[in-house]
């Protein structure tokens, strides 16, 4: 019976081992770059505002415990805005007669989209991302979005 004679020394072993390790890392990076990214929705950060059908078009709904207002626009879209004034952080209220949010501290006023109507506030109310799942409205209450102006991309449609 013949024995295998592997003429391998320590240096060549480590050299091959190192090349193998580098190759594996390179392959891993390439696979990660080519693999499509899927975003997993972590529902722990979301507040369930209720069923979509329970919100009438053109109405604003306060969620005091979450410190936000949910606006169902006339065109059916949803916009969740913070109830915290962007001037000094006072809690704002909604005035249905004037159709505006008003700050009791320094009289800042915001329209129903959260845009500044009267100073001293200089920027719109923060808004919260919204997702729809199983016919429910979920609001990401841990992720308020600071904005410099209102744009239609901030409104979420079914």
Task: Annotate each predicted stretch with a short phrase.
Residues 99-107, 117-126:
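Short cysteine/histidine-rich metal-coordination sites, predominantly Zn2+-binding motifs
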């Amino acid at each position: 019976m013949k024995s295998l004679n592997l003429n391998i020394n320590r240096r060549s072993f480590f050299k091959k081992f190192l090349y193998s390790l580098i190759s594996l890392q390179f392959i891993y990076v390439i696979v990660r770059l080519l693999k499509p990214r899927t975003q997993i929705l972590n529902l722990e950060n979301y507040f369930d505002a209720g069923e979509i059908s329970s919100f009438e078009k053109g109405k604003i709904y306060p969620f005091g415990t979450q410190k936000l207002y949910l606006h169902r626009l006339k065109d059916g879209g949803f916009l969740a805005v913070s109830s915290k004034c962007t001037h000094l952080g006072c809690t704002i209220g909604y005035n249905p007669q004037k159709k505006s949010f008003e700050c009791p501290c320094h009289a800042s006023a915001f329209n129903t989209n959260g845009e500044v109507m009267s100073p001293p506030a200089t920027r719109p109310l923060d808004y919260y991302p919204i997702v729809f799942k199983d016919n429910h409205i979920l609001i990401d209450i841990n992720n308020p979005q600071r904005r410099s102006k209102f744009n239609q991309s901030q409104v979420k449609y079914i």
